[in-house]
From Swiss-Prot:
There is a cross-link at residues 97-220 (Tryptophyl-tyrosyl-methioninium (Trp-Tyr) (with M-246)). It comes from the Bacteria. There is a cross-link at residues 220-246 (Tryptophyl-tyrosyl-methioninium (Tyr-Met) (with W-97)). Keywords: Heme, Hydrogen peroxide, Iron, Metal-binding, Oxidoreductase, Peroxidase. Bifunctional enzyme with both catalase and broad-spectrum peroxidase activity. Its cofactor is heme b. Gene3D superfamilies: 1.10.520.10, Peroxidase, domain 2. The gene is katG. This is Catalase-peroxidase.
């Protein structure tokens, strides 16, 4: 082969460019377990450094000054991307909405909490066309405030300021969103291989979980109607399903659609074939901008974005009742935009209900509605809500303010994480509130006393560990929900979940409540312990006792300060999505799924912020301690149960055992002595993956070594403590 054109360092040629690097391991073995999602967003990719604390930097931010600059930007039209109607408000509302609107309740992923709109795939989704310009318009403000203001916060704040600058009173703003510096690898956006593909439905129109959007590359629904079919009633069904999966009820949905579409316009004046590639596919000289249009100037009145064309209201840069007024005042006729997209025009529209041309106020042009907009009138449930809002403007304004706040803050977790002077005082149930600490906390002496009482109560090590794990492991790093604080494991719906073994759970909680009540009754000076703390403390005591039985004297860290939420503070429907479909740490699977149990283990571990090493040591420890669902023997590779040993790894790696599947599905297995044929162990896929997967086996070998017992216990305690405190935002 000729040496010409070959890289002197890598040896790659033009047919093997550095951008692809040839076949990857995942290309060769596409079913290989994806462990990289456990090691995202490390200090190696973060230019801010390990010591950077955004919370502390945000406290130094002059929020009023930032907002003043944002208000000024709204009407500071730039020649390279001029503002519609001389005001960027509509563009920034769309940017903020699309930043937050990727959130879905099923796994808590998506949303505006990380600034992920800056990276692929979101920066190049068809539904985010030309939002790259919105972020470039914000760059001078981001540049000015630097480390004190994250992109994630700035994008949401810009949406708020856009609304406020056009006369709307928002509900508030909480900062604290921390930027990421690389694309998120843990989010499943769908299996389609083409933009706007919709291979995500089964049955009559059952949307695949955990997805919320109807097509690949859309935030919500297709505005032209389901799969481009302009049927407003059918669109209403899609909207209801999609918005419900984004935590919105019907009233919130109508408020968001009607409120958001009060502002701005759509762009579709020319041939969509003239639109250039998205940012990730654009040429290097475009400097990260995409969708360069060859239609006229490609900007201003010649802008191409969605293919729809026109404003919704006669006055697109002021808060008013224009959207609902137009929706109910006119009958609507199906038509097509100049770009060929289905939309609707008002019949016999009055002169005063025409909108100004976006870049020539001397011209008046018709408004429009999308098929999705007409669902707000024609859907049998949305219609009455929309009419009520139309007849009660103050109710509409309040509903939109609250729904917008929920949209832009739903993925931030509890209210205690919000930063800044504009955090609303009102506590909202979707924030999963927990009471403030109103008593003196227990100290080291009382902690030791309570541990002794718990261990003397007759509760077993597996019972204590299972209860503590069930309480804490509901946490999701995605939207910061769940966790042990609040002791919601004693409330509906968690107390009824199959994985929590309700009968055993009630017995354990009853015993712990007896201990708590007796202890609290004996105290003076207001010192108390919450059940939430006692549940975690019981798990810590069990770990210490199990380690002692193995000959290791350890103290598991414990910091009191959790409180007990009430059933009234707990939205049962909202918490239902936290129920584990599978929990590999308890060897539990609710039913058979299209993904493997080991893949679901990785997914849960990622939500618990566990590394592959932490996941491995935790699972191996929990197996020998007997935490399995319904005391299943699978993976119990020890003759010393309830003792914190490294036996799981020692016996898993023993070549004297030969494994065979017990069914053609390869879901459960039997391990027999190679020489005698005697059954030694049974296992699930989740157990055997730690010997099968090369990366996990390498970690298992560390803990299965002869000198590993001490390190195993130390690492198990550290990982256990991490999970128990994932929701302790008061400590971070």
């Amino acid at each position: 082969m000729s040496e010409q054109g070959k890289c002197p360092v890598t040896g790659r040629t033009a047919v093997n460019p550095v951008t692809t690097g040839g076949m990857s391991n995942r290309d060769w073995w596409p079913n290989q377990l994806h462990l990289d999602m456990l090691h995202q967003h490390s200090s190696l990719t973060n230019p801010m450094g390990e010591e950077f604390r955004y919370k502390e930097e945000f406290k130094k931010l002059d929020l009023k000054s930032v907002k003043k600059d944002l208000y000024a930007l709204m009407t500071d039209s730039q020649e390279w991307w001029p503002a519609d109607y001389g005001h960027y408000g509509g563009l920034f509302i769309r940017m903020a909405w699309h930043s937050a609107g990727t959130y879905r309740t099923s796994d808590g992923r998506g949303g505006g909490g990380t600034g992920n709109q800056r990276f692929a795939p979101l920066n190049s989704w068809p539904d985010n066309a030309n939002l790259d310009k919105a972020r470039r318009l914000l760059w001078p403000i981001k540049q000015k405030y630097g480390r004190k203001l994250s992109w994630a916060d700035l994008m949401i704040l810009a949406g708020n300021c856009a609304l406020e600058s056009m006369g709307f009173k928002t509900f508030g703003f909480g900062g604290g969103r921390v930027d990421i510096w690389e694309p998120e690898e843990d989010i499943y956006w769908g299996k389609e291989v083409e933009w706007l593909g919709s291979n995500r439905y089964s049955g009559e129109r059952d949307l695949e979980n955990p997805l919320a959007a109807v097509q690949m590359g859309l935030i919500y629904v297709n505005p032209e109607g389901p799969d481009g079919n302009p049927d407003p009633v059918a669109a209403g069904r899609d909207i209801r399903e999609t918005f419900a999966r984004m935590a919105m009820n019907d009233e919130e949905t109508v408020a968001l659609v009607a409120g958001g579409h009060t502002f701005g316009k759509c762009h579709g004046v020319g041939d969509p074939k003239l639109i250039g590639p998205e940012p990730e596919a654009a040429e290097i000289e475009e400097q990260g901008l995409g969708w360069k249009s060859g239609y006229g100037s490609g900007k201003g009145d010649e802008t191409m974005t969605s293919g729809l064309e026109g404003a919704w209201t006669p006055d697109p840069i002021h808060w008013d009742m224009g959207y609902l007024g137009m929706l109910f005042k006119y009958e609507w006729e199906l038509t097509k935009s100049p770009a060929g997209a289905w939309q609707w025009k008002p019949k016999d529209v009055a002169e005063e209900d025409l909108a100004p041309a976006a870049h020539d106020p001397s011209k008046r042009v018709p408004t429009m509605m999308t098929t999705a907009d007409l669902a707000m009138r024609m859907d049998p449930l949305y219609g009455p809500i929309a009419r009520r809002y139309y007849e009660h403007p103050e109710q509409f304004a309040d509903a939109f303010a609250r729904a917008w706040f929920k949209l832009t803050h739903r993925d931030m977790g509890p209210r205690s994480r919000y930063l800044g002077a504009e955090v609303p005082a009102e506590e909202l149930i979707w924030q999963d509130p927990v009471p403030a600490v109103d008593h003196e906390l227990i100290g080291e002496g009382k902690i030791k006393e309570l541990k002794k009482r718990i261990l003397a109560s007759g509760l077993s090590i597996p019972e204590l560990l299972s209860t503590a794990w069930a309480s804490a492991s509901t946490f999701r790093s995605s939207d910061k929900r769940g966790g042990a604080n609040g002791s919601r494991i004693r409330l509906s719906p968690q107390k009824e979940w199959e994985v929590n073994q309700p009968e055993q759970l009630q017995r354990v909680l009853g015993k712990l409540e007896e201990i708590r009540n007796a202890f609290n009754g004996e105290q003076s000076g207001g010192k108390q312990v919450s059940l939430a703390d006692l549940i975690v403390l019981g798990g810590c005591a069990a770990v210490e006792e199990a380690a002692r039985r193995a000959g290791n004297d350890v103290t598991v860290p414990f910091i009191p300060g959790r409180t007990d939420a009430s059933q009234e503070q707990t939205d049962v429907e909202s918490f239902a999505v936290l129920e584990p479909l599978a929990d590999g740490f308890r060897n539990y699977t609710k039913r058979k799924y299209s993904v493997t149990p080991e893949e679901m283990l990785i997914d849960r571990s990622q939500l618990l912020t566990l590394t592959a090493t932490e996941m491995t040591v935790l699972l191996g420890g929990l197996r020998v301690l007997g935490v399995n669902f319904r005391q299943s023997p699978h993976g119990l590779f020890t003759n010393r149960p309830e003792t914190l040993t490294n036996d799981f790894f020692v016996n898993l790696l023993d070549m004297g055992t030969e494994w065979k599947p017990l069914s053609k599905e390869h879901e459960t297995f039997e391990g027999r002595d190679r020489k005698t044929g005697e059954v030694r162990w049974s296992a699930t896929r989740v157990d055997l993956i730690f010997g099968s997967n090369a990366r996990l086996r390498a970690i298992a070998e560390v803990y299965g070594s002869d000198d590993a017992q001490g390190k195993f216990v130390q690492d198990f305690v550290a990982a256990w403590n991490k999970v128990m405190n994932l929701d302790r935002f008061d400590l971070s």
